[in-house]
């Protein structure tokens, strides 16, 4: 993986942070906040444009996050705008920024002490400031009114990874960073061209420098630029707007992602954590959402367990699943922490400890550790450190996820739906089994058919887990179904000492003090797709622990003989990644891509997909760690907002990816 290095800072005589890497200050020694307001807000005409803006979300791009001063300043200005203009069309601010050398959290907090007027906003940022993990970190603030996408890594690598459609995504660019003379590697034509590709047709740009090659480079990229008066004693700076934008998309035609068109109502089918997180993300965006759940209450399916572990799925190369689950886990923690401010549900960020219980698991975990991840994300523990961390004697080393923990998914899911139920733009229809989805070409609406009746919606999301085959549109998606049984174990004096989630060839949670039980599990049964109690699975759950931890008496105290348990059916994918996005028209795709290997790239048609039909499926056994970000991704796509993952990672989540992979190789799709 590409490791991220924190900024190395010094502090000058007036308390301004100075980069050791670039020998330059992060902001003006005199008044950095006023300079930000002058250079980036005033010269980009931000206040005037917000008054006239005709879309819900205004997107700002920034080339160097640094201390986050520009972000905090524009956030403050946006709050002032919202208070003064409650009826404005513009409701949301989205800030996309890049940083090669992020400040440590401690340095960030110290830098922000220079601006007491920003302290309240800065504290909200500190709460969710990410560890040094590559690529995009989405931070949702003020109940969705403000979103920060912080891309960690070299901008020359990150900028080509940002997904965008034909219209672009950026309304205004803040071209900021260390002075061109101090950081010549960043200031080049590739940067200016990349900014132009992401820009919308009315995009504006401003920068503190007046260097001639910067102005000429931006003009070459398609911006009309001019010199204007600089801030304070600076004579000049440059500002301008997009003049000639090329219509293009970064999505490959066979992995195309489209937003919902003519959006006025959305139906979500499903009642689990994925549906709850998606409904919340859409409602925050002002959408009218109706939920259909076949059960009498939410979380009756795979999201109904008492305790589930929350931790990332990583690998040493930081590819595939790792590039999805690292940011997804961090977003899930943010999501849960924000939910806990208003809702009551059992959870504990006690950490997760994964035992090196045999040679195979040791090799696998050592390989994962070779990825050089930030210590806030994962640490290796010795035998003694492991025993101290879990609170029980153990004779094996481990890896520890200090930010991990457990939560009660049933309580969280139900609490989210209860909260949503108080809002005017959310309706839940429980005990409503959707039987059929029919697209009405004349009205351009989906008919959602339940027992003997139907309602119409402009868009539909299928998020019903293992029951995805209910509908003809998703029946051919190559997903699997696996039964799992979790055993509920009464606490003993010794087992109550466990103070971290423990993973081996299974998992065990600490005792929940509210019910004096812990959970162990979970079985993996592909043959019996029911929710009946399985006495063999109950016994095997206990045996897996004693087989992996054979030398400790406490492992034998786990008593499953009371047959207390819960069964559910997971919806799983072969590559361990969810299916998120537009639902493909399988029959049409087979026809249009029948000769895909021999088709010239420029002649490849955009993949056939059902209009305004989306899915959020295949979350498997890691749904608690992935559901919030996958829901945020899909809500962003539906609403045509910037997407929170690199474009090649989005391809690995595309619902049609397995069909496309086979067709690109010239293989017939008979069975996946």
UniProtKB/Swiss-Prot annotation:
User: Which cofactors?
Assistant: FAD
Q: Which UniProt keywords apply?
A: Cytoplasm, FAD, Flavoprotein, Methyltransferase, Multifunctional enzyme, Oxidoreductase, S-adenosyl-L-methionine, Transferase, tRNA processing
In this chain, the stretch annotated as FAD-dependent cmnm(5)s(2)U34 oxidoreductase covers 269-672
Alphabetically, the GO molecular function entries are: flavin adenine dinucleotide binding; oxidoreductase activity, acting on the CH-NH group of donors; tRNA (5-methylaminomethyl-2-thiouridylate)(34)-methyltransferase activity
Report the record's Gene Ontology biological process terms: methylation; tRNA wobble uridine modification
Reactions catalysed according to its record: 5-aminomethyl-2-thiouridine(34) in tRNA + S-adenosyl-L-methionine = 5-methylaminomethyl-2-thiouridine(34) in tRNA + S-adenosyl-L-homocysteine + H(+)
An annotated GO cellular component of this protein is: cytoplasm
Where is this chain's protein located in or outside the cell? Answer: Cytoplasm
Query: Calcium among the record's keywords?
Result: no
Q: What is its EC number?
A: 2.1.1.61, 1.5.-.-
Coiled coil (residue ranges): none
For this protein, the record's SUPFAM superfamilies field holds: FAD/NAD(P)-binding domain
Q: Where is this region: tRNA (mnm(5)s(2)U34)-methyltransferase?
A: 1-243
Q: What protein family is recorded?
A: In the N-terminal section; belongs to the methyltransferase superfamily. tRNA (mnm(5)s(2)U34)-methyltransferase family.
Q: Report the function annotation for this chain.
A: Catalyzes the last two steps in the biosynthesis of 5-methylaminomethyl-2-thiouridine (mnm(5)s(2)U) at the wobble position (U34) in tRNA. Catalyzes the FAD-dependent demodification of cmnm(5)s(2)U34 to nm(5)s(2)U34, followed by the transfer of a methyl group from S-adenosyl-L-methionine to nm(5)s(2)U34, to form mnm(5)s(2)U34.
Name of protein? tRNA 5-methylaminomethyl-2-thiouridine biosynthesis bifunctional protein MnmC
Question: From what organism does this protein derive?
Answer: Vibrio vulnificus (strain CMCP6)
